[in-house]
């Protein structure tokens, strides 16, 4: 399993009327918790995986690179920016490097506080994971 970029649907009438746009993402699993997060420019957040839940990222501001490993252990990179939505399956390692300041919302499929072990830290080569 690997990280994938979700493609939104858009009701074009919301764009054509001049007021903006509404872009809709459909999660594969129900979301039970969401968190607003930010990463300062030239720093990382991550170097871990979640053994008990899937996670979705919706980037609301900024640009960065999300690093993961494929099933063969090789690093893969996803460039992300404002409006991108990623699905990160349970057990998939990930780390985000902020090219600019990043703001994003994370959506979890299980409440963090209901997990016996919500996070497992490791090193994906982007810097040391917090203890």
Question: For each of these PLM feature ranges, what is it?
Answer:
Residues 52-65:
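Glycine- and acidic-residue-biased ligand/ion/polar-headgroup-sensing regions
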Residues 30, 52, 71-72, 101:
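Short strand-connecting beta-turns/loops that link adjacent beta-strands
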Residues 47, 66-67, 88, 93-99, ...:
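Short beta-strand His + acidic residue motifs that chelate non-heme Fe in jelly-roll/DSBH
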Residues 56, 77, 95:
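Short, surface-exposed charged micro-motifs
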Residues 2-10, 14-17, 37, 95-131:
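Double-stranded beta-helix
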Residues 71-90:
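Short acidic-glycine-tyrosine-enriched beta hairpin
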Residues 60, 68-70, 108:
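Residue-level signal for short segments within beta-strands and strand-turn junctions
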Residues 13-47, 53:
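A short glycine-rich, His/Asp/Glu-containing loop-to-beta-strand
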């Amino acid at each position: 399993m690997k990280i994938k970029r979700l493609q939104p649907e858009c009701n074009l009438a919301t764009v054509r009327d001049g007021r903006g746009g509404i872009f809709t993402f459909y999660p594969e699993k129900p979301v039970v918790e969401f968190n607003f997060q930010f990463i300062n420019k030239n720093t990382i957040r991550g170097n871990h995986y979640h053994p008990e839940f899937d996670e979705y990222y919706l980037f609301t501001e900024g640009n960065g690179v999300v690093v993961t490993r494929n099933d063969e252990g090789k690093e893969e990179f996803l460039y992300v920016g404002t409006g991108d939505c990623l699905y990160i399956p349970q057990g998939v390692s990930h780390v985000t490097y902020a090219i600019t300041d990043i703001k994003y919302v994370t959506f979890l499929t299980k409440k963090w506080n209901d997990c016996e072990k919500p996070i497992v830290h490791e090193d994906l080569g982007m810097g040391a994971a917090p203890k």
